[in-house]
A protein has these predicted regions:
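Substrate/cofactor-recognition hotspot
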Residues: 108-110, 114-119
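Acidic, glycine/proline-rich low-complexity segments that act as flexible tails and inter-domain linkers
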Residues: 3-5, 9-66, 87-94, 118-132
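Compact alpha-helical subdomains of small soluble proteins
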Residues: 97-100, 105-106
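Short, structured motif recognition centered on aromatic/hydrophobic residues
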Residues: 68-76, 105-106
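Glycine-rich anion/phosphate-binding loops
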Residues: 84
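Short acidic/histidine-centered micro-motifs embedded in hydrophobic/aromatic stretches
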Residues: 105-109, 124-125
């Protein structure tokens, strides 16, 4: 099961910034962007992203979208995925996390995923926060 979870995180992390800028509740917009970004080259991946990630995982009631953003940002920091982190920081703010909470998450993750990952995350956060 952990392999499936890891694959879902990587799939989520691979979406471009424009997709993650939409609030998670805007499912139709997210689906159309998924199709636009990858549907012509990877239709099955686009379908799984729409039907599993956005329509199921992000909508499950066991975690709020704010909490899902916190989990996703933490995973992206741990995996040192700065390109995907940028878009998910935007999404995290849209889902109710504050800049202070996101910086605290980066600081906390430094002790679990390493200083280089945290330093990279701080640089990305600084750029995202400046784009207000």
């Amino acid at each position: 099961m952990s392999g499936i979870f890891a694959a879902a995180i990587v799939m989520a992390a691979g979406m471009e910034a424009s997709m993650a800028q939409e609030p998670a509740s805007n499912l139709d917009s997210a689906k159309s962007r998924t199709q636009h970004l990858m549907g012509d080259i990877a239709p099955k991946l686009a379908e799984l992203t729409d039907d599993v990630l956005y329509a199921d995982i992000w909508e499950r009631p066991q975690l709020s979208q704010r909490d899902r953003s916190l989990v996703t940002v933490s995973a992206l920091i741990a995996l040192n995925r700065p390109d995907q982190l940028r878009s998910h920081l935007v999404r995290a703010k849209a889902n109710g996390l504050t800049e202070e909470q996101l910086v605290e998450t980066i600081t906390h993750m430094a002790f679990y995923s390493g200083w280089p990952s945290a330093v990279s995350a701080v640089a990305i956060a600084k750029e995202v926060f400046a784009e207000k």
